[in-house]
Structures are given as structure tokens and as C-alpha cells.
């Protein structure tokens, strides 16, 4: 048996030897292929890196960033600064009339000294010794004097400084008596404050008088390209407020006979504002061609 197994083992060992002998060439081939692949990769690596970097830079430069830029949401806005006031602006005032003073006289004096028109919007307080004119009374209205203390329900009116006529302004008051009676009318005399009286008022520097209705003209007036615009003669526009201590007395029409235009300055430069010409009550310049002989329109 041993003699029979020995040749078989010898054949198996002999058959395994060629396999062992063929293994090293395969390993050599694999190593050779690896070395060639490494060399090829080493040769192509610089070019490939440059291409990838160029592609990355191009994509980053061409891509638009998402979202708003940093700090753009809360940027401070520049403040709005008004460096010059308009001559037609209204200024609000709270006027307090002391006890024992005549409200009508106090408002008129305030308008004259300040050189502006005053519009009384409302009033609160109590008055005594009221002289009013009631239009509903017989014979075209009568003047009555009320003695006693009355509470102000409503007080409105205007006060214009000279040279405006007295009929252009005035006060209207409605009062409540102690027994619940209500009386009112145009203030025709004294209106004495019985305690502090607070008035809400608005002042204006310029007021233009227009007579209505405006008659239609056959040909429309020519349009001007500048700031100054002439009004049609049918409207008979005139300045109600004239020149006072603080008035701008310069003739904005250039002395061409169009009539002087004067208004109260109120401490602001209004030489750059131009208004239409017209007859100013009592202030028409005699040097103009037709300003001196114009008649004052009736209220």
C-alpha cells in the first residue's frame, strides 16, 4: 500500500509545482501594471488639478450670492429737512387769555403786532358782559348786552391786521347760561373773559381776496413758464394782509404798474415767492401805472 501511495503523492507534489512556479509571474504582472498606472496618474495629475481649480473658480465667480448683503436691511434713511417755509403755511397756536381781558381786543392786538392773520378754531372757558349782534332779531338785527357768567360752547372767527377792512374779520360765539339757555351771535363789542380762556388758533401770512363767481373769458389767459402766474381780471384778486413792521415791502412785479404785492414775513425769507398782482387794500403804490386808481372791491 505504501508503495502505491508514494507514487500518487509524488504526482500531486509534481502537479503543484507548476502552479507555484506560475504564481510569481502573475504577481510580477500585477506589480508592473500598478507601476504603469501610477506613472500615468502622476503625469496627468498637474493638468487635472489645474482644470478642477479653474472650474471651481469659474463657478464661484459666476454664481450669484443668495440673500441680501450684510447690513443692507437696517440702513439709516437721510432725514427730510425743510429749509424754507411757504408764505401760505398755517401755524397752529394755543392762545390763553387772562381773566378780565377782552377776548376780541386781545386777538385783534395779537394779529396786529405779529403782522399775520389769525383764525380762531375753537375756545373753552367762561365769559361775562357779552355784547353780541343777533341777525334774527327784528329790524335787521339788534345789539344786546348779556350780563352774568356764561360758558363758551363755540368760538370761531378771524382777525386780520391793517390795512384789511374791519368787515373782513370778526368773532362768532355761542354761550350757555346758568339756566340752560343757549344764546349766540356775532361779537359786536366786549367779550370779557371770566377766568382763563384757551383758544385754539392758526396763523397765516398771506391771504388773497377773490370775488366769486369767476366770469368766463372768451380767450384763456396765456400760460407762463415761470413761478409767477397772472390771474384773470374778472376774479379781482387782492391781498387782504398788507405790509407791517415785519412785512416784505419789495415790489415783486418789478415796478411795471401791476400793483405792489406785500405780505407778512413772519421771520422767514419770502423774496423768492411771487404772487399775482392786484389791488392791496390801502397799499396800492402810486408809482405804478394803474395801481393807484384801482377801487377796492366790496366784501
From Swiss-Prot:
GO terms for biological process: negative regulation of gibberellic acid mediated signaling pathway. It comes from the Eukaryota. Residues 44-72, 224-239 have a biased composition (Low complexity). Residues 87-233 form the PPC domain. Residues 1-87, 216-251 are annotated as: Disordered. Disulfide bonds: none annotated. The PPC domain mediates interactions between AHL proteins. This is AT-hook motif nuclear-localized protein 25. The gene is AHL25.
